[in-house]
Amino acid sequence: MNKANQLVINYHITEKCNYDCHYCYAKWAKPNELHRNVDEMKRVLSKLAEYFLSPNPIQQQLQYQSVRLNFAGGEPLLLKQRLIDALDFAIELGFETSIITNGHLISDEFIAKHSHKLQLLGVSYDACRYEVQKQIGRITRSGNVLSVERLQSIFKQVKRHSPSTKLKINTVVNQFNSEEDFIGVMASLQPDKWKVLRVLPVFDSIQTISDQQFESFIERHQSLVHCMSAENNDSMTNSYLMLSPDGAFFQNGNGSSGYFKSRPLLTTPIDVALAESGFDAIKFAQRYH
């Protein structure tokens, strides 16, 4: 069954980040980011709403009931009020919303004021040990990391302020954390979903891991199968509907190319840009089954 209850559009709103993860593919050589011109950003979001929230070929194919705009980065919370404004506008247009963040900038105030707006809050978390976080690059310039204790506090507060907001952890299995043990931390966090992704060699500089390393990580965490969703490289390719910071659809490629982009949505009809993007709706649906 190639059906999906919800279509997800991942809007990589900024390339800026307070971390420097070695495997990150969110690098667009500092494009002209759409959010800097609020009117243009609103035009693009409005075009997306007009197309995807009305009958269209993808909707006919997947039979989705709702569309979620997922704000990603870089680190979206670096944009502060500009992110909140984009979030509020997306809700006004009729989107469900979510954020994927490294969690470092989530304040208690942010949770109290805004967590109820989110259908889902995702936190990228690759290691519990400081040394491994440092090797991966999940560390600020001043040497700070997101501790397990702070992550637990974030989850607890979101559950209190917005019980309907689903909580997700994303973990990228890479050369540095393939031996990490997440059983204890997941038992304490109780996420609705733990997405385990194999590091994707989008650029030549990104070190891959072997099938065996990835599979043994999954096997070691079999006790978490009730919340774990594992994605190998093939299932990740062409199965995400992604918008770059400058407002074009893109897909991850491999090697030196990094990614493939459509023309900008500001000046291109959505259906044309969609055809240029290489998005595969069937592969998207398969990730949710």
Regions found by a protein language model. Name each.
Residues T101-G103, N254-S257:
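Short glycine/proline-centered loop/turn elements that form peptide/ligand docking sites
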Residues A29, G103, D126, V199:
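Flexible loop residues that form catalytic
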Residues Q65-V67, L93-F95, K117-Q119, P163-T165, ...:
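Short, well-ordered coil/turn segments that N-cap beta-strands
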Residues P76-L79, H104-D108, V173-E179, F203:
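Acidic-and-aromatic substrate-binding clefts and catalytic sites of carbohydrate-active enzymes
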Residues M1-G73, L77-S98, I106-A112:
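Conserved alpha-helical substructure of the radical SAM core
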Residues I9, L69-F71, T97-I99, L121-V123, ...:
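Hydrophobic faces of well-ordered beta-strands that scaffold small-molecule active sites
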Residues A49-L53, K113-K117, M186-Q190:
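Acidic (Asp/Glu)-rich catalytic clusters
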Residues E33, R129-F250, S257-Y288:
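Radical SAM enzyme [4Fe-4S]-AdoMet core and its adjacent flexible, acidic
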